Amino acid sequence: MLDIKKISSLSDLSELKTAYFADSTAPLDGMWHFGFVPMSDHFGFYENGKLVGYCVLNGEGYLLQFFLTATANANIADLFTLIIENNSSVIGEVKGAFVSTAEPQYLSLCLDNTESFKVNALMFRQRPTAIANNIENIEMTLATEEQLDQLVEFASSAIGAPKEWLTGYYGNLIARQELWGYWESDSILATGECRKFDEHQTQFADLGMIVAQAERGKGLATRVLNFLTQHATSQGLEAMCS
């Protein structure tokens, strides 16, 4: 008999999360798995009181993670179908799923139960044999707490992200010294992120950047990405981005 219960403490899933990332065939998108997943609802799968799996559902009703241990007695395909057909009163309505091609088991379950799909993002990973290039260097500076409001305004205007979310997100990056800015005459033209992982995928650095709309198409993004890649490499990390 399998029971589904809402998880109140994410620390209960520590071992299962480790197994989940170990099963991936490539590094997973840090923004999704360490940004959006922690703020979403987690549900545990229990057999005789033992936690044998879990899934994650965001506030819009989309699955973000799905995992069942190999030692579980439940049939993973039947369990997945039960959930996505909205037959779990605990989980509730499921509208769809976000899944990476680097998550083979979860991807297979999604493809077996989907009517359509579309690509949301492409993941890129630094080549181990990457060679030096002739990209023009760019001088970026670490963002400070005093610059937070201006950085939030810049990002909100450039990509339309909610200011409340950006304030918390950028504030955390500034505290971790993982956010840079490129300025000209006190105006921000671009931001760059080089995010480290506290657990799982710790050999990687997840890169991100935003360029002002008026500055796009001029090669600035290439220079920012090159700066971030060099910074990651200098710390012995392999760069990735989406």
Give the ranges of each region predicted by the language model.
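Short amphipathic alpha-helix that is part of the acyltransferase structural core
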Residues: M1-L28, A130-E164
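Generic N-terminal amphipathic/basic segments
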Residues: M1-Y62
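Active-site rim helix/loop that mediates acceptor-substrate recognition in acyltransferases
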Residues: F21-H42, I159-W180, E184
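A conserved beta-strand-loop-helix scaffold within acyl/acetyltransferase catalytic domains
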Residues: M31-W32, L57-G61, G168-L179, W183-A212
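Short hydrophobic/aromatic beta-strand element in the GNAT-like acyltransferase core
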Residues: S40-G44, Y54, A121, Q177-G181, ...
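Acyl-donor-binding surface of acyltransferase catalytic domains
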Residues: N58-Y62, A70-E136
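Conserved acetyl-CoA-binding loop-helix of GNAT-fold acetyltransferases
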Residues: N73-N86, V211, G217-S234
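Conserved hydrophobic beta-strand within the GNAT/NAT acetyltransferase core sheet
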Residues: A97-V99, L207-M209, A239-S242
